[in-house]
């Protein structure tokens, strides 16, 4: 066989491989129907959204301006009664970096949802607060409440900071502290986890996911790494 034909065959093989790769990539995010992911059902975007909103928790547009306007404050103190209510102890204020990153995390939600955030002592369609704790809640890295939980709970989110757990002290772009802030704010807006699991309730893993796309590759409300769905955001 001549070198010309050799090269032609190699070129054809390379083209075939390239087509296969492109075709595979073009179907990478196909969802729903009878598709499965890791042996689990594949949910469409609408099905996944319904899963996140299954608790029916949401703020109301009280002034009828067509959007949800929320106010927020960074707590400077917390009474013992408040700490007891949440099952935590060791209050501390957000540091400068936490405040700046919380504002950016809120902006990331405002960029994709019909919601605004204004730092103000009260008012709006709902009010959010941020604070740190050093122990309690079975060692959860953070926790927050869905709208409608009740007075003293709605809009509140708390973040673990102590000598043994430090990520929340230094949140930044692409690190776990920033991810935690954005995740917990998602809860205060009314979003649940994609599946029925929670920190402190046993030791859930991706095996407990209801559907295949329940990873951070598709929603930051998930507990599970995007690596479970063959993605890498690092």
Where are these regions (language model features)?
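Short conserved micro-motifs at the rims of enzyme active sites and ligand-binding pockets
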Residues: 83-85, 230-234
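Metzincin-family zinc-dependent endopeptidase catalytic domain
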Residues: 27-65, 97-216, 223-232
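Disordered inhibitory propeptide/activation segment of secreted metzincin zinc metalloprotease zymogens
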Residues: 1-94
């Amino acid at each position: 066989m001549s070198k010309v034909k050799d090269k032609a065959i190699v070129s054809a093989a390379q083209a075939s491989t390239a087509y296969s790769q492109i075709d595979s990539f073009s179907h990478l995010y196909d969802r729903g129907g009878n598709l499965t992911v890791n042996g689990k059902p594949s949910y469409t975007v609408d099905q996944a959204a319904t899963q996140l909103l299954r608790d029916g928790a949401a703020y109301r547009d009280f002034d009828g301006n067509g959007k949800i306007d929320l106010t927020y404050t960074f707590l400077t103190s917390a009474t013992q009664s408040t700490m007891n209510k949440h099952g935590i102890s060791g209050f501390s204020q957000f540091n400068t970096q936490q405040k700046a990153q919380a504002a950016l995390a809120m902006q990331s939600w405002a960029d994709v949802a019909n919601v605004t955030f204004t730092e103000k002592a009260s008012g709006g369609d709902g009010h959010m607060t941020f604070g740190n704790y050093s122990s309690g809640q079975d060692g959860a890295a953070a926790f927050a409440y869905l709208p409608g939980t009740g007075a003293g709970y709605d809009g509140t989110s708390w973040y673990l900071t102590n000598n043994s757990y430090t990520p929340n002290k230094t949140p930044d772009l692409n690190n776990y502290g920033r991810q935690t802030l954005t995740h917990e704010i998602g809860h205060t807006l009314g979003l649940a986890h994609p599946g029925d699991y929670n920190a402190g309730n046993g030791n859930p893993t991706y095996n407990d996911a209801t559907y295949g796309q329940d990873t951070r590759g598709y929603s930051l409300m998930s507990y599970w790494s995007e690596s479970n769905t063959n993605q890498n955001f690092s």
